[in-house]
Amino acid sequence: MKNPQKLAITFLPLYVIPTYTLCIKALYKNTHAGLLFSFLGFVLNTPAMSISGPPTTFILYRLHGVRRVLHWTLPDHEQTLYAFTGGSRSMAVKTDARCDTMSGGMIVLQHTHTVTLLTIDCSTDFSSYAFTHRDFHLQDKPHATFAMPFMSWVGSDPTSQLYSNVGGVLSVITEDDLSMCISIVIYGLRVNRPDDQTTPTPTPHQYTSQRRQPETNCPSSPQPAFFTSDDDVLSLILRDAANA
């Protein structure tokens, strides 16, 4: 009789991979912030995520009424312009979570062999990201899914800028119902504040931040006390990372 331990190890992926795929699809298809936050809370409280050190940050854009306006390619460059009618943006740092509604706007996705640029522009939110990665070929087709590991990133919104050489994963999912999910997972942050009087140990992060009026919170999301109402997304990430 064959070794049962070897058999278990051999057939384990047949159970784990489909289960993981179903969980991801269920997460992206569900529009209720409560389920999203419950899932993130479960992940963030697992032993693997509870170790000491910088927090893992999740940013999720759930957009609907998406249509592709423009798409063109060059030998070493690809750009796609999308329009959307509305959506939401959710984020979680450690065990803290927040959800904001978004009005209609535009998305620009630019991709080269080493850098991917993502810009989301609407009346209630403007965010721009640049992700540095190794050679990666994006196949931007309708109803396509891709996940791209990155080595460093730059983010900016109307009040904040952040540079970080901490890596993570960017994923984009387009679905049959004219919806799109964009998720950014960042594996930790270490922050230098420019107003520190002491000379800090050199770290690869710099930012500036101011305050502005908040967006409207999603109706189905709680009103948590750990996020002040006049913080921007990057400001929240930076503050929680600094306090980690």
Curated annotation (Swiss-Prot):
Which Pfam families does the protein's record reference? Herpes_UL4 (PF03277)
Q: Which domain of life is it from?
A: Viruses
Signal sequence span is: none
* Location, primary (coarse class): host cell
Residue ranges of the TM segments = none
Comp. bias (Polar residues): 205-220
InterPro entries, A to Z: Herpes_UL4 (IPR004958)
Quote the subcellular location field of this record: Host nucleus
Q: Does the keyword ATP-binding apply?
A: no
* Keyword terms, alphabetized: Host nucleus
- Provide GO CC annotations from the record: host cell nucleus
The UniProt annotation puts the region (Disordered) at 193-227
Homology family: Belongs to the alphaherpesvirinae HHV-1 UL4 family.
Q: Which named protein is this?
A: Nuclear protein UL4 homolog
Q: What is the lineage of its organism?
A: Viruses, Duplodnaviria, Heunggongvirae, Peploviricota, Herviviricetes
